[in-house]
Design a protein with these regions (language model features):
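Extracytoplasmic cell-surface/polysaccharide-interacting catalytic and binding patches
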Residues: 2-264
Length: 264
């Protein structure tokens, strides 16, 4: 009898059953895997989409706020002479502006008329208002600054020169960092001492300053912006339109220039 190589019906049935079982298991595994991918894949996509939406919305909100904040920004350039910025972050060499005398104080000749009118207006509020300081050369600022440092060290012998300088810089700037060398800044008060004038009087003078192109340069609460504490006597010429805009916004010159350099 010739043997055939085909399995018997029982063997075939047995093999078929195992094949069906294995196939069913594989299909079930694939279906579960597909389901998990569908759930977590979609979730991840939604999270990524939502994350992008949040970032985009946040940026749009920031831009909208900034755009609103800079609405009506004057059409001027940071390079305009009225906006010259001199501070400890923007030191300058000797500028040698053309100067003019106003009541014994030197100022940039281009603002002499404004200084006279501003002083006269301040004197209508309080007749004791007078000019204390105006233009200073870098050489003179060096002498003044060094003398202040020496005074602090004499008053407190425990201070190092570095500590004395740090103390001095709360009321006077190092050579090259003083706004007085521009000729665009004036110190004007009813007294010859910093922050000792009547606050109500100072507030009135501060309010009328923009009419003559000036702003109170170092307002209270703005040290983080200017690097200088409150000074009730230091006014800076920036031009009438800009002075009115800055005052209305409650900005410092630094803040105005930041917006001017980086508009939306």
């Amino acid at each position: 009898m010739v043997k055939n190589n085909y399995p018997s019906r029982r063997q075939a049935k047995k093999q078929t059953n195992w094949f069906l079982i294995i196939s069913s298991v594989l299909i079930a595994v694939l279906l579960v895997a597909a389901g998990l991918y569908s759930v977590f894949g979609v979730s991840r996509t939604v999270q990524q989409t939502n994350g992008s939406s949040v970032i985009k919305s946040s940026k749009q909100a920031t831009d909208a706020t900034r755009s609103k904040d800079t609405k009506g920004l004057p059409d001027v350039s940071p390079k305009d002479w009225e906006l010259l910025l001199v501070n400890r972050d923007n030191e300058s060499k000797e500028l040698n502006p053309e100067i003019a005398d106003v009541n014994g104080v030197s100022v940039d000749a281009r603002i002499a008329k404004n200084v006279k009118e501003f002083l006269a207006a301040a004197q209508e509020i309080d007749p004791s208002y007078h000019l204390i300081s105006g233009y200073r050369s870098v050489a003179y600022q060096t002498e003044l600054y060094d003398s202040y440092v020496q005074q602090e060290m004499v008053a407190d012998p425990s201070l190092t020169k570095s500590q004395a300088e740090k103390k001095v810089q709360t009321y006077s700037q190092p050579p090259g960092a003083s706004e007085h060398q521009t000729g665009l800044a004036i110190d004007m008060s009813t007294v010859d001492s910093l922050n000792e004038a009547d606050p109500d009087t100072v507030a009135k003078v501060k309010e009328l300053a923009p009419k003559y192109g000036f702003v109170l340069r170092f307002p209270d609460g703005k040290t983080s912006s200017t690097g200088v504490g409150y000074e009730d006597w230091h006014f800076r010429y920036v031009g009438r339109g800009i002075a009115q805009y800055i005052t209305a916004k409650g900005w410092t010159l630094e803040e105005f220039l930041d917006h001017l350099n980086d508009p939306v």
